[in-house]
């Protein structure tokens, strides 16, 4: 007979005798990853108690943080939304405010919002091998509060919420206008009739350009080099047809799978036939822009498709803004800032009232939380990642990170289900700790994110390591991971035990 979590071992999976502030699971973050984890963990382990610690004052995570004009999904909303809660709006590329509303409604529908402690910034987590529990320290209203839990799930993403990346631009202090980073967009910034320069060519920059152009006098996207852009319809015909023929949830799952397959096929085609994909994207740009437009200078990257993340432009909105004369792209290098704007190395000058530094993110593992084992601090970047969601020799800790080439939620949901599955397995055997162990066999290292984006290359030393063979190989392949999950050998390279069965772990 399989025991339920609370029946597994007397006192090990319930709050009896554990004292105030104890729960079975602490989830860090109330965005996509945290909400998914809460749903999946309790779906499979309904008796487990949990608390979500969210540093912001609202649900949404990234989708509450980013408030810049035009913020939206950069992949299909049907793969970004949860498989268990259908996306019901018509658009397949969703605005940030609607994603935030969807997350809030989902958390409320399943009672997840009742478990959230807002304004709780997790600073540290220390594992105690004498009791097989984590002590999690959170900052709330300037004071520190401690929680204890058997398990910790980090759904806090992969980048620094406090500050984005801005290069040291020469003379930036002399600029007389306003400098804004999209990660901290001022609510009261009025850009109507202003001249705006957006520095960057990534997803944020290409989202900002057409949106700002609706009200600004002139918007210029200044890039050092081009990025591949792919245009897709904001309102998909497949979703509309599926909703007419199928019940709501079935339609959602069908469109979700269709979107995941098309994204995977296009990625594979980009890898296998880069010249063909490059030609297709170039033809789209030529057909969408005015005759004679210098497509090769501004929209022909030097690298192959998907060597860096490709940027989505719904209904070719960026090309349309350029064609309408409301926006432009300049490919050049910055020499220095001056009072009136940006002097270029080519000798040109971009006048500006507002400069937006869409120059990237700063990555960090586990939300910047200090992790220690029996009081000995560890560095996550020294550890290999196990099945993309646990750290080598770190017990009862899970970390959710999405794909670089597909929607975040595809891996987030696999991670949440794998976590729930492991917790159920542990409960059935009465285990109180589990950790992946590589042993002494040498392992070839590789970056856990195999993409050449600047924000990744700048921060390789901030992320855990990937190996080159399972289960330590971090892949960017949803379907391979989904198959692995289905046939998962849950005890592969894992050490299980009960409280006080082993010596304390060293860092």
Predicted regions and their residues:
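Short beta-strand to alpha-helix junction loop
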Residues: 87-105, 117, 199, 269-278, ...
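Beta1-alpha1 glycine-rich phosphate/pyrophosphate-binding loop at the start
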Residues: 23-27, 32-116, 223-224, 288-293
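Feature captures the FAD/FMN-dependent oxidoreductase FAD-binding
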Residues: 91-160, 336
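Glycine/threonine-rich phosphate-binding loop and adjacent beta-strand/alpha-helix elements that clamp
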Residues: 358-426
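Rossmann-like dinucleotide-binding core of oxidoreductases
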Residues: 15-22, 26-28, 32, 37-49, ...
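Core beta-strand elements of the Rossmann-like FAD/NAD(P) dinucleotide-binding domain
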Residues: 23, 142-151, 191-192, 345-354
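Glycine-/small-residue-rich beta->alpha transition segments that form the dinucleotide
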Residues: 127, 149-162, 183-185, 202-203, ...
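C-terminal active-site-capping segments
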Residues: 413, 417-507
């Amino acid at each position: 007979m399989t025991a339920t979590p609370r029946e597994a071992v007397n006192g090990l999976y319930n709050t009896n005798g554990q004292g105030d502030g104890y729960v079975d699971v602490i989830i860090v973050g109330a965005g996509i990853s945290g909400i998914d984890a809460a749903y999946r963990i309790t779906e499979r382990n309904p008796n487990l108690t949990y608390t979500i610690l969210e540093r912001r004052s609202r649900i949404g995570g990234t989708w509450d943080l980013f408030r810049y004009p035009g913020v939206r999904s950069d992949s299909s909303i049907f793969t970004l939304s949860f498989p268990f809660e259908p996306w019901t709006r018509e658009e397949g590329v969703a605005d940030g405010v609607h994603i935030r509303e969807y997350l809030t409604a989902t958390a409320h529908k399943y009672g997840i919002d009742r478990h959230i402690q807002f304004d709780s910034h997790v600073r540290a987590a220390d594992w105690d091998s004498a009791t097989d529990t984590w002590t999690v320290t959170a900052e709330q209203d300037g004071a520190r509060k401690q929680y204890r839990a058997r398990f910790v799930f980090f759904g806090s993403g992969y980048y620094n919420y406090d500050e984005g990346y801005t290069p040291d631009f020469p003379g930036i202090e002399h600029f007389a206008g306003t400098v804004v980073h999209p990660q901290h967009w001022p609510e009261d910034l009025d850009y109507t009739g202003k001249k705006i320069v957006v520095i960057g060519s990534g997803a944020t920059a290409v989202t900002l350009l057409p949106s700002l152009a609706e009200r600004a006098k002139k918007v210029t996207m200044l890039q050092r080099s081009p990025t591949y852009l792919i245009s897709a319809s904001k309102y998909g015909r497949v979703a509309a047809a599926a909703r007419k023929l199928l019940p709501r949830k079935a339609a959602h799952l069908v469109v979700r799978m269709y979107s995941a397959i098309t994204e995977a096929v296009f990625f594979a085609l980009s890898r296998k036939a880069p010249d063909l994909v490059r030609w297709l994207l170039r033809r789209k740009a030529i057909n969408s822009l005015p005759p004679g437009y210098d497509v090769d200078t501004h929209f022909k990257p030097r690298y192959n498709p998907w060597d860096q993340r490709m940027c989505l432009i719904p209904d070719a909105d960026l090309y349309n803004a350029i064609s309408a004369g409301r926006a432009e792209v300049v490919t050049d290098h910055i020499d220095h800032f001056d009072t009136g704007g940006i002097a270029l190395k080519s000798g040109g000058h971009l006048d500006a009232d507002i400069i937006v530094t869409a120059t990237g993110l700063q990555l960090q593992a586990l939300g910047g939380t200090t992790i220690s084992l029996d009081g000995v601090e560890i560095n996550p970047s020294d550890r290999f990642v196990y099945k993309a969601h646990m750290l080598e020799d770190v017990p009862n800790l899970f970390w959710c990170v999405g794909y670089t080439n597909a929607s975040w939620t595809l891996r987030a949901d696999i991670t949440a289900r794998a976590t729930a599955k492991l917790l159920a397995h542990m409960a059935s055997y009465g285990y109180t700790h589990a950790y992946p162990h590589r042993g002494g066999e040498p392992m070839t290292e590789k970056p856990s994110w195999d993409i050449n984006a600047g924000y990744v290359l700048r921060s390789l030393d901030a992320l855990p390591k990937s190996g080159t063979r399972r289960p330590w190989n971090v892949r960017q392949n949803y379907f391979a991971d989904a198959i692995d999950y289905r046939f998962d050998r849950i005890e592969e390279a894992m050490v299980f035990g009960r409280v006080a069965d082993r010596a304390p772990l060293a860092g």
